[in-house]
Amino acid sequence: MRPPAFWFTPPDSPALAARLLAPLGQAYAAATARRLRAPGHRAGVPVICIGNLNAGGTGKTPTAIALMQRLAARGIEAHVVSRGYGGRLEGPVEVDARRHRAADVGDEPLLLAAFGRAWVARDRAAGVRAAEAAGAQAILLDDGFQNPSVVKDLSLIVVDAAVGFGNGRCLPAGPLREPVEAGLARADLLLSIGGPEAQRRFATDWPALPVPRLTGRLATLQMGMDWQGARVLAFAGIGRPEKFFASLRAEGAELLRAEALDDHQPLGEALMKRLEIEAMALGAQLVTTEKDAVRLPPSFRQKVLTLPVRLEFDDGAALDEALDRLGLAARS
């Protein structure tokens, strides 16, 4: 289901629907605040939470990949712990791409497992214990900023600079899981992801933030594929599929059709066969995201290309300093 447009009107001029739903949003915020008072498990290794204030996709997965690689470059073995949204396994279980499918562990953990060790656990504290017992020197919590079951040593809030915090209201009146002020008061760093214009707009709409702000962008990973003039039928079931379509256009691809699916939508044989027939009629190549690709039926994995992206920090000094303070300096 796509988010309603009124979630993203300016904070100082909310739509009528947002105003009518405001009491429910206030109740949601109060429930979140009560839940956060519960005590959490303290791990024996640093725990870094990659979270957000918005519901839906903001760029947490590429941020987790970037942090895994950054810590690996320091000689730190970091494990990711995720709830495994969309998967059937409760865990804790270590993700193994050789035997697990997205239906087992969720698409995001399956993708993250290609970059390091990843765990799925409905009970995050149990997942952290399992990762620590398996030798994790640091733990990355994929989401879970509003879940108190694990004590966080560093909380990094990720936001899509193009949409910011929307109208600044909590679900269902807006896109937020909790008020901006309350969330940032518990955070250590804010990462806004987007191009220069989106970053400028975010800075204007949300000035005087109480935490250090990092900026970054999602850059296409060059894999030797020349997209210039390529005729494609693109499909994506991520938080903001239009960003993926824009990336393809920026690479020079000719999008003959772009199909926005629901976030985490299953890619069954019937759906994929329909897309394949449409692509053949258009003389187009099927293309999707890395995260969607792990949900493809086996019979389509060789038929669909991906456009991988990686997070590039504009200046990661504040992040490096925070990692150093956690005792995660480079090791020989």
UniProtKB/Swiss-Prot annotation:
Belongs to the LpxK family. It holds the Pfam family LpxK. It comes from Cereibacter sphaeroides (strain ATCC 17029 / ATH 2.4.9) (Rhodobacter sphaeroides). NCBIfam families: lpxK. It comes from the Bacteria. The keyword Isomerase does not apply. ATP binds at residues 54-61. Its EC number is 2.7.1.130. It catalyses: a lipid A disaccharide + ATP = a lipid IVA + ADP + H(+). SUPFAM superfamilies: P-loop containing nucleoside triphosphate hydrolases. This is Tetraacyldisaccharide 4'-kinase. Keywords: ATP-binding, Kinase, Lipid A biosynthesis, Lipid biosynthesis, Lipid metabolism, Nucleotide-binding, Transferase. GO terms for cellular component: plasma membrane.
